[in-house]
Amino acid sequence: MEKTSYEKLPLPADAETAGVKAATLVAFTEGPAVDAAGNVYFSDIINNRIIKLSPDGTRSVFREPSFRTNGQTFDQQGRLYHCEGSEFGPGGGRRITRTNLESGAYEVLTERYDGVRYNSPNDICIDGRGRAYFTDPCYGDRSIMEMEIEGVYRIDTDGTVRRILAQPAIDRPNGIAVTQDSRRLYLVDSSPLKEGNRKIWVFDLDDDGNPSNQRLVHDFAPGRGADGMRLDMAGNLYLAAGVNVPRHAGETRDVPAGIYIVSPQGNLLGRIPVSEDLITNLAFGGRDGRTIYITAGKTLYTTRVAVPGQVAYPKWA
């Protein structure tokens, strides 16, 4: 099989030729989510806080401590969901929480499964019916694990939590996205181990949100695989993947850091290069849904694309 030359992938035809621009700097960025007013909420995991960046560039602390929040997303009602993890220091929540931005109400949706704590909830998405799907790997201290499984879970609208994917079907789940017709689930399966998975899977979903018919969309091996992921309105995947300077034996220079655009059929459509390590996640925003915000290292970057993002909230004009 011919080796893929990731570094030679062109900018997607709809991306700004100027590339990405820095929007703001913190310590270690993750989990961007954008509300209807254009405010960007993103995690600063090392400093244990969530930052709010207003459209005028004003930066403020939204929550501190954040209980090591990682991925975030909005539901159809404009409520902000948080994956409270366990990485980069003590005080991690190891749970899924939700904030009502209008009232300020903050609630715990789930913090245990079968009586034991989650590993480190990593990323989350909402389907068209309001159900939440989240991943629970362990990339940090594995001695804290109370369960042997690194799985994917669904929170139904009545609050019931079900584990829907686990080993051996998957290795280490990370980024996750569900189409707004609630029919397909995309999953990043990304292990830091040299022989671990660096795959993107797709599953069919039935009416109850149960996955089946697992297929491979793309495999980034032997390079660093993807982290966060989003979908656009055309159904294409936007994957925060790769590394510019490998950190350990499980990473190579085969996949340079950037946002990789992949069709639902697995075709590589382009790459938006990002020069800073470590690229982690992205979110769609802006009045028309065509601005993307990218978290990488200490920086929140922004650029423009032609196709709006596919999100539960807000709905683009």
Segment roles from a protein language model:
Residues 1-317:
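Sequence-structural signature of mature extracellular/luminal beta-sheet repeat domains
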